[in-house]
Structures are given as C-alpha cells and as structure tokens.
Amino acid sequence: MPETDGAPRRDHRSQPRRSDGKRAANGAAGDHGASGRDAPLYGALDLGTNNCRLLIAKPSRDGFRVVDSFSRIVRLGEGLSRTGRLDDAAMDRAYEALLLCGERVAKRGVDSSRLMAVATQACRQAENGEAFIERVRLGTGLKLRIIDPVEEARLAVRGCLNLFDQSVEAVLVVDVGGGSTELNWLTKRGDAFVLEGWMSAPVGVVTLAERHPEPAGDLDGWYEAMVADMGAAIAEAPVNPALRDLFVSGRAHIVGTSGAITSLAGIHLGLRRYQRNLVDGLWMTRADCEAAADTLMRLGAAGRAAEPCIGPDRADLVLAGAAIMEAVQRAWPSERVRVADRGLREGLLLQQMREARKPSRRRRRGRS
C-alpha cells in the first residue's frame, strides 16, 4: 500500500462490501467507547519490519472514525536476516518516520494514555532491537512496546473480524509482514468464531525477497522457489488436518490482511490510484490472485515501480508477498479470499476503546 503522509485519507470511513452484497460497518466494527463530537481521540502506532503506520481515531456508534493516518515504508528489517542486527540506515529511516508520527499525535492532542505504540518482528528478532526502542523513547517521547507473535496475531484478527462471512464454518486470517507471516485458523461455534490454532512463520516479504533476489531470466522458476520456501515454512500447521476439508469444499475462506493482498487487489481492479473503499472488503478468487501475480511478474521491476498501487518502494517486494499468499492458498485451497486493508492498528484501537468502556474497580466497589 502506498505511503500516505499527507492529509488523512477520507475513505477510511468507507464501508466494505459484505458477502451478501450489503455494506459493512464503518471503520472496524466492535466495541467502542463514547461516541460523538466529544469522544476522545485514540492512537495506534505499528512499527513493523517494512512499514511504520499510525491511525488516530475516535469512537463511533458502529466502530470508529479515522481522523488522521500515516504510513511510510521504512524497511527497518533490511539486512536483518543476514546480520541479526538492525542496520544504522534502516534505524534512521524508521526514527524519522516515528518523529513525524509523534508530531501528528501531539498536533491532534492524543493523550499518551490513549496511544498504543507497538513494534513487531524486526525489533523482536534484532539483538539491538531494545536499544533502538530506547533511542526512540529518548528522542521522540514515543514508548513503543515490542509485542510477541501471539499478541500480534490476536490484534490483527480483532481488526478484521467484521469481514468474516458469517455463513461459513471456518476462516483463515493471513497477516503477511515484512519479517514474518501470522496464520490464524478460526471455526464457527454458535454465533462466534473461535480460534482453533495459530502459527507464526519466520518468512515475510523482506526476508523472502532477500533470500530470492529477482533474476534476469526464468522468472517462473524464481517465483516457484519463493512459493516453495513459504510452503515449507507452513507445512506443519497446528490444527486438525480435517479442517482443510472445509476449505476444499467451499465451507471456509481466507482473509488476507497486509500490503501483499491489497497490492494484488489494486492490480486486479486496474486502479490508477489506490482506493481503500474499493479494496477493503473485496472478494477475490484464487484465479484472480494468480492472474494479478502473473501481471506483476510480466511487468518487470520498472513496470511495477510505475504502478500507482505498488510504487518504487514496493516494486521488489510485492511478488514475494504474492508468493506467500499463493503458498497459503495451495496449502489451504479456498476458492475465495477476502481483502482486508485493516489489521493490527485497528485491533489496537478496538482494544483500547473496549477497555475504556469497562467500569473502573472503584466504581464497581461503590455499587457493591
């Protein structure tokens, strides 16, 4: 997804298509605090292996309304798989982006108690990850917390729950990051989806692209090698093998939440500029995903860089993301994939708003 460090995108409030043809709720449906003009602002900051993203929102009746957003590709994990450390230039890029995030938070008047700032795989893996987090705290005032893969996956699932087709028996949520990919299997029990299993594969778009540099020739062989690499990483899924039958028979579907799938969606739709209201909630078939990946491969690096939904910063990563999605679709062959331009940040916002609704212990004691 292209960076957006200008004015906030107005289409964050748009409503994605549901499986029944109706529109889904604004923002991300779920728990929320007080709504209306006087509602407080909440912030969610996600520093990943590839991107630095910020959302600022206020609660609404059916979720939340985004009032400001920021996204910049920083490639914090560049070279990490080779050295085990965050590179100086990569840290500087991330630091500059975080400075801008801090300025936006201050400008909007978001209270520090209502800002959740997290770091994921790159800082988890790097031996100097904690030192970088401390540098950010001292220099920007932002207190980032390195979260583990379990919490990262849980938040991503929460952020896209209202994109689940309520008529199916199972859903697989795939969150493709820069340094890892989280997979979450949920099954329908009554009116709710319950987590059946989870895994974090240490393969993301940055790590896969670094392992498999794009060659001058034999692009098909290169792409298949990336698919096989990811396939090996997810071969041992921590769920009952019988669950796969639900995907084969059309009683389950996949939700993809990342730039990997939104990029494929933009190519599939032929967008001349990225439009979240057309991408978020879109249904794609497996054939649609494969055709979009083939289009990207035939474009070449220069052609991909010129695509408005890809851009030069993602031109060398987007096919790694497509290969990851294809590996998942081969292992869990759902005919339908739902595109989610939402995930971890939205989960962070919903978690805060849910906590704000809970009565304090003092108030509970006063009523007893």
Q: What are the functions of these language-model segments?
A:
Residues 45-51, 174-180, 257-260, 343:
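A short acidic Gly-Thr/Ser loop motif
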